């Protein structure tokens, strides 16, 4: 499975340059294969008198020895008739322990240290695992976060969509998952920044360094200011690193993509540059195929998994837009982060009613778990239905039964909050891990009214039942 860049197989000449699209002429009997990486030397505008190497990826064979390529870097300074070398292999990236704590670009170049890598590399274009290699059983991925494990359980080797605007705790939740995979599951994480703002990427690296999770994480960035070819391939580069950890090191991997919409957007730009006829809403005609090539590689093989969390931007909040709609078809769970919930100071600010999971079903989880989740959802839904009446008439106008629903729902809502490990640097409070069995027992007890006499404040930002009792004790309740 080891792959290194082969020696040059042929030399061609630049025939045409149109922005990131470069047409290259080769001898008819030495045409490079689709997805092969080509190298061309060009004057480096940053260093006078020096040359830099541009990487081009073959996208189309036009015939008569002509190939159309997409450049992975800006083509400023590239001239016609410049010699182009076929590397004989696809773009490849470093794999293995070397990648942990490092920041890479799409081409596998290290960005945060000067250390050069001479070890094993894998090509970014790889086949999905064969059907007989896939893990057949559906297993829950326990995180220790109450609201996720109880109401929107994640699938080991599944794909989770993460919805949330700015400032609702998306980055903290991502970092917390990286921390928990490293410490609770002895796993590793890979983060692919697809079309990330440079500032966002820089902030993420700084925050991960401060919270101590960066040494268990490989980061790959294709920034917003880079050509579409780079932004289209960066997710594949990150996924290739994740596949090595899964297949060779036999680890459970958490793979983050931020933002999957920008992957689609980059594909649309490349499709237009290649002259393809646009499809619905101007997207590329091969949208579903392109998404499938990425998503089908994110899966569990026998005993080991890649679990993916994908941040999803929804254009104009239109869920029927082809980009998010195509992504939804692949998701096993959706975690919606809500601004109104974060404004109450409840973190993680997961919306318990909007968030869903494929395995929140008695066929996949214990009946006790399913029943507890349904009780919590029902009580929160009733509380939501009563909000308008409370806003207009006040809580005193409700019947006794409705008052009891509101009383317990407010406690349930606050008990869904939890301190995270990575936020300790801001809060000074240790994070908590709550086993699923304890979460189920706790929420059943709250819904049964066992803790009706505890004040609401006692339920806020605590872990399990012991934390709840300690909080109540501090507030003077026995």
Curated annotation (Swiss-Prot):
Catalysis performed (reactions): ATP + H2O + 4 H(+)(in) = ADP + phosphate + 5 H(+)(out)
Protein name as catalogued: ATP synthase subunit beta
Organism the protein comes from: Streptomyces coelicolor (strain ATCC BAA-471 / A3(2) / M145)
Alphabetically ordered keywords of this record: ATP synthesis, ATP-binding, Cell membrane, CF(1), Hydrogen ion transport, Ion transport, Membrane, Nucleotide-binding, Translocase, Transport
Family matches, as InterPro entries: AAA+_ATPase, ATP-synt_VA_C, ATP_synth_F1_bsu, ATPase_a/bsu_AS, ATPase_alpha/beta_chains, ATPase_F1/V1/A1_a/bsu_N, ATPase_F1/V1/A1_a/bsu_N_sf, ATPase_F1/V1/A1_a/bsu_nucl-bd
Keyword Zinc-finger carried by entry: no
Record-linked SMART domains: AAA
Binding site for ATP: 164-171
Location within or outside the cell: Cell membrane
Record EC number: 7.1.2.2
Assembly behavior: F-type ATPases have 2 components, CF(1) - the catalytic core - and CF(0) - the membrane proton channel. CF(1) has five subunits: alpha(3), beta(3), gamma(1), delta(1), epsilon(1). CF(0) has three main subunits: a(1), b(2) and c(9-12). The alpha and beta chains form an alternating ring which encloses part of the gamma chain. CF(1) is attached to CF(0) by a central stalk formed by the gamma and epsilon chains, while a peripheral stalk is formed by the delta and b chains.
Name of the gene: atpD
């Amino acid at each position: 499975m080891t792959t290194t860049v082969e020696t040059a197989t042929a030399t061609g000449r630049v025939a045409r340059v149109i922005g990131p699209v470069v047409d290259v002429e080769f001898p008819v009997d030495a045409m490079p294969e689709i997805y092969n990486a080509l190298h061309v030397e060009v004057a480096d505008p940053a260093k006078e008198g020096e040359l830099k190497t541009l990487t081009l990826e073959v996208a189309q064979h036009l015939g008569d020895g002509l190939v159309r390529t997409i450049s992975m870097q800006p083509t400023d300074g590239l001239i016609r008739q410049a010699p182009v070398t076929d590397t004989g292999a696809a773009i490849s990236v470093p794999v293995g322990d070397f990648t942990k704590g490092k920041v890479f670009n799409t081409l596998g170049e290290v960005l945060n240290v000067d250390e050069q890598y001479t070890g094993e590399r894998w090509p970014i274009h790889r086949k999905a695992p064969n059907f007989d290699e896939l893990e057949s059983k559906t297993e829950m991925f326990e995180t220790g976060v109450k609201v996720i494990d109880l109401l929107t359980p994640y699938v080991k080797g599944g794909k989770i969509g993460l919805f949330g605007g700015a400032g609702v705790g998306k980055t903290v939740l991502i970092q917390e998952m990286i921390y928990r995979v490293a410490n609770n599951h002895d796993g590793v994480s890979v983060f692919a920044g697809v079309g990330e703002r440079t500032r966002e990427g820089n902030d993420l690296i700084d925050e991960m360094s401060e919270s101590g999770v960066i040494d268990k994480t490989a980061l790959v960035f294709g920034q917003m200011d880079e050509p579409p070819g780079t932004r289209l391939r960066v997710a594949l580069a990150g996924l290739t690193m994740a596949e090595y950890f899964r297949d060779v090191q036999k680890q459970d991997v958490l793979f983050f993509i931020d933002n999957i919409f920008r992957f689609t957007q980059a594909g649309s730009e490349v499709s237009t540059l290649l002259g393809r006829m646009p499809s619905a809403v101007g997207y590329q005609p091969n949208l579903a195929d392109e998404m499938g090539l990425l998503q089908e590689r994110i899966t569990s093989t026998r005993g080991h998994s890649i679990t993916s969390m994908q941040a999803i931007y929804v254009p104009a909040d239109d869920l029927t837009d082809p980009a998010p709609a195509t992504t939804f078809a692949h998701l096993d769970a959706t975690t919606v982060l809500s601004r109104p919930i974060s404004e109450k100071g409840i973190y993680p600010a997961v919306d318990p009613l909007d968030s869903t999971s494929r395995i929140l079903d008695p066929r996949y989880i214990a009946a006790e778990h399913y029943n507890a989740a349904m009780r919590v959802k029902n009580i929160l839904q009733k509380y939501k239905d009563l909000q308008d009446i409370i806003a207009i008439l006040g809580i005193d106008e409700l019947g006794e039964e409705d008052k009891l629903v509101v009383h317990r729902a407010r406690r349930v809502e606050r008990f869904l909050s939890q301190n995270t490990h990575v936020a300790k640097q801001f809060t000074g409070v240790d994070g908590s891990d709550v086993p699923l069995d304890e979460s189920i027992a706790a929420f059943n007890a709250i819904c049964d009214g066992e803790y009706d006499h505890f004040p609401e404040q006692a339920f806020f930002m605590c872990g399990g039942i012991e934390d709840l009792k300690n909080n109540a004790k501090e507030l003077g309740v026995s």
